[in-house]
Amino acid sequence: MTALPSKNCSFQYQSHQAPRSLDATCLLLLIILGKVLLNVLILRVKRKDTSWSFMEYFCFSLALVDLLLLVNISVLTYFRDFVVLGIRFTNYHICLLTQIVSFAYGFLHYPVCSLACIDYWCNLSRATKPSSRWQKLLYLLTVILTWISVLAYVLGDPAISASLKTHKTSVNQCPSYVSTQSHWLSLSMLMILSVAFLISWQEVVALIQAIRIASYKNKAVLYFPFPPHTSYTVSPRAVLLPRLIVCFLGTWFPFVALQVLILSLRVQIPAYIEMNVPWLYFVNSFLIAAVYWFNCHKLYWRDGMFPVDPFINWKCCFVPVHRLKQVERPMSIIIC
């Protein structure tokens, strides 16, 4: 597959000539199949006791779109040249479908992250939660509207349409598109995380040395040493920041290292691969931590006030265990 330059400012491209002996279609099928299996794996291993949010709905919709993409490419590959309702489908449509999906995925990073951040911010500042049925319906409609909007933009943008028509006769070569949205989003997250770590690295080290893994209500949790509290209000930002960093890196450190490696080597990943469920859950955890830090003065130990992360139990950053009966004998102690 070959990546070609475009005038669209939201994308970057690189060119490379694939070996003629390599079947690009089979390679594309294997890539999409691997992505679908990875999406299914992440959706199965995530925590099941999570409350639904916009990001949860979008992750499931993305997994469904990837599955539909795999089915369509498989059908086009198997039949190769066939006619349906007077429309002739060939190998060219495999390339066309991949290009459209790549453009759509490439434009989704900023809107999805913005909507997820607004969702968590509103849920945190709201005293009472709305009806669960109406909230789920709102999430579903928002996800559908997001997909429709981005597809309408991709199909209606003159520059993208011109790029798609340029390669209409090309069968052996297919342009692959690389979104710059994910690049800048990843770079921004890593910079914020680095600054936060530099500001509170001493507290982070001290906290890691004091962390205990304890059994709390028949679940293994990280037990942070809390100073005496007279209420259930959370600690100030300076105290909360190292706890958030430890929780985030404790879960997503391999993914953070992968992002550093990708940015350092300037690896160009096609947009249809880069937009995936693990990446969205990684961004989701970062957004939740950021919302917690900015709104630490509003947080209380109440289940309804905490957006639930499918991979991180953020309550261990806030909940002081005052009654020793609630905490069983520590299973282990982590010492740096």
From Swiss-Prot:
Q: GO molecular function, one example?
A: G protein-coupled receptor activity
Residues with glycosylation annotation: 8
Q: Does the keyword Transmembrane helix apply?
A: yes
Q: Chief location of this protein?
A: membrane
Q: Where does this protein reside within or beyond the cell?
A: Cell membrane
> Could you tell me the superkingdom of the organism this chain comes from?
Eukaryota
What ranges are annotated Extracellular (topological domains)?
Answer: 1-21, 78-95, 158-187, 265-272
Q: Which residues lie on this side of the membrane: Cytoplasmic?
A: 43-56, 117-136, 209-243, 294-336
Query: What task does this protein carry out?
Result: Orphan receptor.
Q: Which PANTHER family does the UniProt record give?
A: G-PROTEIN COUPLED RECEPTOR 160-RELATED
Q: Which family does it belong to?
A: Belongs to the G-protein coupled receptor 1 family.
Protein name according to UniProt: Probable G-protein coupled receptor 160
